[in-house]
Amino acid sequence: MSSLATDLQPIDWSTIEDAIYDWLAGGVEGFDAIVPDAIWEDQNVAQPDYPYATLKVTAHRKEGGRDEVRTTTLTGQPAGQEIEILVTGPVQMTVAVTFNADAAAGGAASATRARSLAAKAQASLGLPAVVDHFRGAGLSIVAEEGVTDTSLVINGEWLARATLDVRLRTATQMTQRAGYMDKVQLETDDLGVDTTVDGS
């Protein structure tokens, strides 16, 4: 039996990242934006105006249990590609959302502002509109962790920040093309059988 892996990506990261961005920056119908803009930490872009959020997938792991395997017979395919095997498995990811507030208001006031934005994002994860929004991207909300004050001083400048970790679940999908066996050799000395079964 021959096989051929397809070019399907296990996880549609583009759709997932867009869904997370839209949740924070106003892409959910019936729900106001939490911040005017958000960026992924690995993006090579200019820093947005305050307040804004930075995003990062900090963990990504497969959940326990066996993957689901489905097979489909395809018509009109060349030999060796008549069967499509789809393997699906659940995975969890942790997304760190850091809210950055304008430090011009002063250390205490700006830190409170950052924590308030994180708390608003945390509470919003229970709204039906937000739940449906993530579901449309193939995501389910597993848990939202506590809000952590991650403010710090860099080069003498106070940076007011608060971080919220969100655990999301999605599924990996991989497909493989396979074919039927052309021939099977059957041989046994006890029964005196020595034959070839042609599967074509």
Residue ranges: model-predicted function:
Residues E63, A105-G107, T172-Q176:
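Residue-level signal for secondary-structure boundary sites
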Residues S116, A123-M174:
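Acidic-leaning, charged glycine-interspersed low-complexity segments
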Residues M1-Q81, D182-V184, D189-S200:
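Small/polar-rich, solvent-exposed N-terminal microdomains that initiate assembly or binding
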Residues S2-I11, V95-N100, A108:
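Terminal, regulation- and interaction-focused segments at domain boundaries
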Residues G80-V87, V153-I154:
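Short beta-strand/turn micro-motifs at beta-sheet edges
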Residues V87-A104, A121, A160-T170:
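Oligomerization/assembly interface segments of phage tail-like spikes and tubes
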Residues N155-S200:
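Hydrophobic secondary-structure block in the mid-to-C-terminal portion of proteins
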Residues T98-G126:
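Structured, beta-strand-rich domain cores
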